[in-house]
Curated annotation (Swiss-Prot):
CDD domains xref list: DSRM_RNAse_III_family (cd10845), RIBOc (cd00593)
Family per record: Belongs to the ribonuclease III family.
Gene: rnc
Full protein name: Ribonuclease 3
Function description: Digests double-stranded RNA. Involved in the processing of primary rRNA transcript to yield the immediate precursors to the large and small rRNAs (23S and 16S). Processes some mRNAs, and tRNAs when they are encoded in the rRNA operon. Processes pre-crRNA and tracrRNA of type II CRISPR loci if present in the organism.
């Protein structure tokens, strides 16, 4: 493995990798058939669990008053493929990944998943090198600011409700207009949102979209998902 790449990864992660073979494996996709060192799949499996644990720990300390429901939504957002892929691109990892010829035109969701997998595989290598303490600075560097920004401006209530419902058991929110009143130039919509296993809520607004958002907010607040007092530092 090129020394320049190893030095670059040290600058990006803050970790001096001890096992060069595992590092090569973390950057190798399964489509590389003649690869002697194997691919990143097993490492990604381990790294996914390490990432989840350290993000959960970080959120537990950052938001001491947050409910379990809110912490779960935040965790899901911070460890999902899109966030990990964004971090991979921030680190310019895609340029380092070895892929087979047929995979060089990856795009869309498959590309996002591959970039995310490599981040998790690198986390596994760090963990195997030196345990959780070897990974924690890397998590702080790339995830802590993202965790804090999530509270600086709330995400769309419908998006957050959908994520929360998924965590509860692959449920999906269903929205239904139950009433429309008022003149055409000043309408009032009432929308009911329901999730299997939970009581429904009704929102009201000047548009269908606003009414849906209000209904989603009611469930998020009722279930304690939207209730936060933020702590400034994660130590």
């Amino acid at each position: 493995m090129r020394r320049l790449m190893i030095d670059q990864l040290f600058k990006l992660t803050g970790h001096r990798f001890k096992d060069e073979e595992k590092l090569k494996r973390a950057l190798t996709h399964a489509s590389v058939q003649d690869s002697e060192q194997g691919n990143y799949e097993r490492l990604e499996f381990l790294g996914d669990r390490v990432l989840g644990l350290l993000i959960a720990e970080m959120l537990y300390q950052l938001f001491p008053q947050a409910s379990e429901g809110e912490l779960s939504v935040r965790l899901n957002h911070l460890v999902n493929a899109q966030t990990c892929a964004d971090i991979a691109r921030e680190m310019r990892l895609p340029d380092m990944i070895q892929v087979g010829f047929e995979m060089r035109n990856f795009e869309g969701r498959r590309l996002i998943n591959m970039h995310a997998d490599v981040v998790e595989a690198l986390i596994a290598v760090m963990y195997l090198d030196g345990g959780l303490e070897s990974v924690r600075p890397f998590i702080q560097k790339y995830w802590q600011s993202r965790a804090k920004k999530m509270d600086a401006g709330r995400r769309d209530a419908k998006t957050e409700l959908q994520e929360w419902a998924h965590i509860q058991g692959d449920a999906q929110p269903h929205y239904q207009v139950i009433k429309r009143s008022g003149p055409d130039h000043d309408p009032v919509f009432m929308v009911e949102v329901s999730i299997s296993g939970f009581a429904s809520e009704i929102g009201q607004g000047s548009s269908k979209r606003n009414a849906e958002r209000m209904a989603a907010e009611k469930i998020l607040r009722r279930e304690g998902v939207w209730k936060t007092v933020e702590k400034n530092d994660y130590e």
